[in-house]
Amino acid sequence: MKKIQAYYILFFACMVSRLVSSINYIEDIDSLRFALSLYEYNISNLQPHFPGYPVFCFFVKIMYSVFENMGIAFSIIGGISTFAVIYFSLKITSTDIISLEGAFLSFIVFFNPMMWIMSNRYMPDLMGFSIALAVLYIFIYKDHKTSNLSIGFFLSGLLCGTRLSYLPLVLIPFIQHLVRGSFMLKFSSFLTGCLIWLIPIIALEGFNELVMAANEQTIGHFTNFGGTVVTNANMVERFLFLVESVWADGMGGFWLSRSWHTII
């Protein structure tokens, strides 16, 4: 089998599997906010919450306008993101997809329970992760021509509008390349990647309203309703929640109040 054929098969498998397992119900409050953003994008009304994830919402909105099905819209983006995660994982590890190692890597990422859940969930995590991997590949392994690096900086700007909290994943190579010559060109590429989503948000929300939403959500997340030591100082509970998130959510293992199927 040729490499390009293997990638086509992988892409088809990612899309079909995620579409078949798409969900048409709201799992949690964050999913509700992203679902409501398809009807009316309004950060001030927490549709979704700040920072708004405009790049992700934009592409999901396009899918929703075409298929008129919320579950399918999010799963299409999830399927594409799953393929991108596998693709750039293979690139970063310099692994051929048609090799035994490549097939194994593709298999464990494709069937990873957390990855599968996130590909169907109404959240931007997987899309943000796929962009972060693309940026890391360009910054670390790709030929470091100015044109290639400019693409990496542009994608970094898009990453800020997809999943801002994932920017630290690429921060070290980002800074290293930024200070090594052609500063203005690289910074301009990053700024373009940011402005392409920031200008529409400011026009839609209003600058003052956006700043107020940012202030309320940032302070609230770290001092009121977020999962920090300030909002929950019981370290035993925090440790148990950590174990649950890794074992049950990440590895798909059994936990109280979860389906008995997870025991298998």
How would you name each of these model-derived features?
Residues 168-195:
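Perimembrane helix-loop-helix junctions
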Residues 51-54, 58, 66-84, 118-122, ...:
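Loop-to-helix entry region of an early transmembrane alpha helix in multi-pass inner-membrane enzymes
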Residues 11-14, 102-113, 137, 156-160:
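Short helix- or helix-capping micro-motifs
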Residues 2-29, 40-41, 160, 192-211:
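Transmembrane signal-anchor helices characteristic of membrane glycosylation enzymes that use polyprenol
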Residues 54-58, 62, 209-264:
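Membrane-lumen/periplasm interface segments of multi-pass, membrane-embedded glycan/lipid transferases
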Residues 29, 50, 114-127, 209:
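Short acidic/glycine- and proline-prone juxtamembrane loop motifs at membrane-interface regions
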